[in-house]
């Protein structure tokens, strides 16, 4: 993408994120977004198919950023969870707006799929404990759904809880499955 398009895309995403913090998704129009971003309608539609497409891309960007690979070791669950929480915390304004608004379902689904993918890479194929008696698909879904619930709880409480404590609490809820 050329620099001009990237600048317009960034302005649209920033404007949309601001609007999501101010009002419900269903009340936001493409007109509101382009007015806030200072771009034309043709520019918007050259980059996004619709407001829903913009929402999906925003959510995807946040989910992708959450799992950015910075060399964090995948063999230490605490380090891995803290890394993801730190990346979500960096985008907490957008996450809070998505969790609280009409985009919450899209955000939850995207994050669940992203975490399931990561869990599939890190959870042993034949885990110990009760997890070993579960179907793999169910186990991965449970781990990811619990993670999404934790992120929602954290956002609903304005990210006030310490990331390390949230990570420890999440793992305390999940680890008994593997003992």
Predicted regions mapped to residue ranges:
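C-terminal peripheral helix-coil segments that are non-catalytic and often amphipathic
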Residues: 136, 145, 153-179
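Amphipathic alpha-helical segments that line or abut small-molecule/effector binding pockets
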Residues: 75-93, 141, 149, 164, ...
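Amphipathic alpha-helical packing segments from all-alpha helical-bundle domains
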Residues: 83, 104-148, 179
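An amphipathic alpha-helix adjacent to DNA-recognition modules
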Residues: 6-17, 21, 26-38, 45-71, ...
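Secondary-structure edge/capping motif, primarily at the C-terminal ends of alpha-helices
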Residues: 69-70, 95-98, 123-126, 154, ...
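Basic/polar phosphate-binding segments, predominantly the helix-turn-helix DNA-binding elements
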Residues: 2-5, 33-55, 87-90, 94-98, ...
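Conserved acidic
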Residues: 4, 8, 103, 107, ...
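Hydrophobic recognition helices of helix-based DNA-binding modules
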Residues: 16, 58, 62, 66, ...
């Amino acid at each position: 993408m050329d620099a001009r398009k990237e600048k317009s895309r960034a302005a649209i995403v920033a404007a949309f994120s601001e609007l999501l913090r101010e009002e419900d998704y269903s009340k936001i129009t493409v007109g509101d977004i382009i007015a806030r971003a200072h771009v034309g309608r043709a520019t918007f539609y050259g980059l996004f198919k619709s407001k829903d497409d913009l929402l999906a891309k925003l959510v995807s960007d946040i989910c992708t950023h959450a799992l950015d690979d910075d060399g964090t070791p995948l063999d230490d669950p605490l380090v891995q969870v803290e890394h993801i929480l730190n990346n979500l915390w960096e985008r907490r304004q957008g996450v809070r707006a998505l969790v609280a608004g009409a985009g919450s379902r899209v955000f939850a689904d995207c994050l669940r799929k992203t975490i399931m993918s990561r869990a599939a890479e890190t959870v042993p194929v034949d885990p110990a404990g009760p997890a070993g008696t579960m179907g793999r698909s169910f186990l991965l879904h449970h781990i990811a759904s619990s993670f999404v619930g934790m992120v929602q709880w954290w956002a609903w409480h304005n990210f006030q809880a310490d990331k390390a404590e949230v990570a420890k609490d999440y793992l305390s809820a999940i680890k008994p499955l593997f003992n």
